[in-house]
């Protein structure tokens, strides 16, 4: 994985993937998985946040649900930062993300705020791009944005920098690529589902995705 960009920072090199093997172990779920993501967030924050930064004039924006696994730890690193959540859902027909609700109105002077967006898996980048698009409506500035993720693939990263070249992106590790169904390679499942369980009205999407992918493999 030799992709480079001046605003991309990758913490763990490809040859040290064994350090994040638990991320791909689908038997690691719930509190155990939350701790794994939290510990990696602590480590990543040493790269993304300066030593004496306590979060003055900053806001942490977790993309629900999975982003909370990172923001819960980041708030301890940046205790003075505000937190404004954004909830993404999938259109049940197109499977594309849309904003269900957000807490951005509570943020005063958003144009001057430093922003930390948390979302563990950066695959197609659809949720992050939709978040950045939505933030602009409130006055947030790309040059003040730091995106923090566990894993990301080149195609999703390129989409972000093409549309938002001024943001900074901090990754724990680069993924190999992306599957046809939009999940990362190596496959790590749905982070929100591994943490909190499958949403009732989306369980059919998970089954359809898994079945469809298996059929493609058998061709």
Language-model regions, residue ranges each:
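PRPP-associated nucleotide enzymes
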Residues: 1-219
